UniProtKB/Swiss-Prot annotation:
Organism: Photorhabdus laumondii subsp. laumondii (strain DSM 15139 / CIP 105565 / TT01) (Photorhabdus luminescens subsp. laumondii)
Active site: D79
PROSITE patterns: TRUD (PS50984), UPF0024 (PS01268)
Any Pfam family hit: TruD
Protein's name in the database: tRNA pseudouridine synthase D
One Gene Ontology biological process: tRNA pseudouridine synthesis
Keywords, sorted A to Z: Isomerase, tRNA processing
A GO term from the CC aspect: cytosol
EC number(s) stated in the UniProt entry for this protein: 5.4.99.27
Origin superkingdom: Bacteria
Length: 349
């Protein structure tokens, strides 16, 4: 199921607009949730980059430092068509810190460096702060109304277009792999294809719950998550009224699956519901099981934190917010304006 087919929380937006008329209209600042140690065999490098692919920057840092590309890590991929600030981690055991004054890469600026004891691993961040500018908005008041709704009720926690690659190629190739039409040897491609498969399955289940307006209605066997935590527990039928109130109060969140080679995590009615909407992905799920990917859960909704906006003129609005790691700003924008799909392709790294 492509993003255009997923259900909206507040209905498809009537207002149109443009995101990313230029990279400066999409600013991302990584929030690791911790500060570097100040000592250790790893060197943390904080970079501001414009129009640069994350892996390309990592490879450039590796060449400059004279180390293998595998010795440079980062917490996550960032959008290419954007201005992004993120940390890279160079493993330099017993080596002097390179003189970054002579490091030159178009579109990149080194902000600071610091030593670190441990490697920076994928996913090791708290979240990201976003500052976006939406232009050529067709209906000022409709966008204003949407922003107020989102401030109160959040948005679907869908995986965005970036997860599926340009023109959905990651998911297309995953399906070919699942059908034994191709062999995938490259580790990074295997990871991208499996991730796209699981993301599509999550989106399908989350969209189905939203279509039935059950995104915040606890049903028997639901897997519930403490807000902001990764672990979950199964809703006991005897406690449904209490659990329902905790969901309404924002203490708990209803989740959908990122399937793996084990059980979904739900039971009874909720498990039956999820299996129904995962059935079209049976071959991809078999691939995921074969590759022994560990399953997990993800909240169906996400609440943008510190959401604020300022109208620069009647058809241009600047929006700022913070999202936890793994959530997509483009899924927030999707609830605000109806974008031309030709513009959406500029979002994919």
């Amino acid at each position: 199921m492509v993003l255009a087919e997923l259900n909206w929380l507040y209905g498809q937006p009537e207002a149109t607009g443009i995101l990313k008329a230029s990279p400066e209209d999409f600013i991302v600042c990584e929030d690791l949730g911790f500060s570097p140690d100040g000592e250790g065999e790893h060197l943390m490098v904080h970079i501001r980059k414009t129009g640069c692919n994350t892996q390309f920057v990592a490879d450039s840092l590796a060449r400059f430092a004279g180390i293998p590309s595998r010795s440079v890590s980062y917490a996550g991929l960032k959008d290419r068509h954007a201005v992004t600030e993120q940390w890279f981690c160079l493993h330099l055991p017993g080596k002097q810190e390179p003189d970054f004054a002579s490091f030159q890469l178009e579109g990149c600026e080194i902000l600071t460096t610091a030593r670190q004891k441990r490697k920076l691993r994928i996913g090791a961040l708290k979240g990201n702060s976003f500052t976006l500018i939406l232009r050529e908005i067709s209906h000022h008041q409709l966008v204003e109304n949407r922003l107020r709704l989102i401030q109160q009720g959040g948005v679907p926690n869908y995986f965005g277009e970036q997860r599926f690659g340009r023109d959905g190629q990651n998911l297309i190739q995953a399906q070919r792999w699942a059908n034994n039409e191709i062999r995938v040897k490259e580790r990074s491609k295997r990871s991208f294809y499996l991730s796209a498969s699981r993301s599509a399955m999550f989106n399908a289940v989350a969209s189905a719950r939203i279509a039935l307006k059950q995104q915040q209605q606890v049903i028997k066997g639901d897997a519930l998550q403490l807000t902001g935590r990764g672990s979950w527990f199964v809703a006991d039928e005897t406690e449904l009224p209490l659990l329902q109130q905790r969901v309404i109060d924002g203490e708990l969140q209803i989740t959908a699956p990122l399937p793996g080679d084990g059980e979904l995590g739900t039971q009874h009615q909720a498990a039956d519901f999820e299996r129904q909407y995962l059935q079209p992905y049976e071959s991809l799920w078999e691939l995921i099981k074969r590759e022994r990917v560990e399953g997990c859960r993800r909240a169906i909704l996400v609440q943008p934190q510190n959401l604020s906006w300022q109208w620069q003129d009647n058809d241009t609005v600047k929006i700022s917010f913070w999202l936890p790691a793994g959530s997509f700003a483009t899924s927030v924008v999707r609830e605000i304006i109806n974008q031309d799909q030709n513009n959406v392709t500029n979002i994919v790294e």
